[in-house]
Design a protein with these regions (language model features):
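Nucleotide-sugar donor-binding/catalytic module of glycosyltransferases
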Residues: 1-150
Length: 150
């Protein structure tokens, strides 16, 4: 995807009490095969060590921005993150998720190849006992399709 590397993808992560999962998530983001990303970590008033973990990685990787805010809920955290976005495309990740190494590259390629404005990826939910696949394909939409669906 080097020919499209000028397209910046913004990643918003809403974080609340996610310190057990956060390093795995951040490492999966900064290890993406597609490098032109900005990462907006929104610490939603976590009383655990989440904020400190975010700050640690912001020092390590200049693509990471951290916003600390009082707890207002997931939607509020995402909305505050949206105020900082500078990318052409956006993905929103939860603080207890992680990404496959080619997540951004693959979805960006699908969007560009299909002339879509939005893509939804495969979601895999795991517990200690099992792995459950919720969606088994990539779905894409134009802006008009998405507006109609809402």
């Amino acid at each position: 995807m080097k020919y499209k590397s000028n397209i910046k993808v913004s990643i918003i992560v809403a974080i609340y009490n996610s310190d057990k999962f956060l390093e795995k998530l951040i490492l999966s983001i900064i290890g993406q095969t597609y490098k032109n990303i900005e990462v907006i970590l929104v610490d939603d008033g976590s009383p655990d060590n989440s904020g400190a973990i975010c700050d640690k990685y912001a020092v390590i990787d200049s693509r990471i921005k951290v916003l600390h805010k009082p707890n207002g809920g997931c939607c509020d955290a995402r909305n505050k993150g949206l105020e900082l976005v500078t990318g052409e495309f956006l993905t929103i990740i939860d603080g207890d998720d992680w990404l496959e190494p080619d997540y951004i590259e693959y979805l960006l390629r699908v969007v560009l190849q299909t002339d879509s404005d939005m893509a939804m990826s495969l979601n895999i939910f795991t517990t200690r006992e099992r792995i459950q696949v919720k969606f088994d394909k990539i779905e894409t939409w134009t802006s008009e399709d998405a507006a109609i669906a809402i």
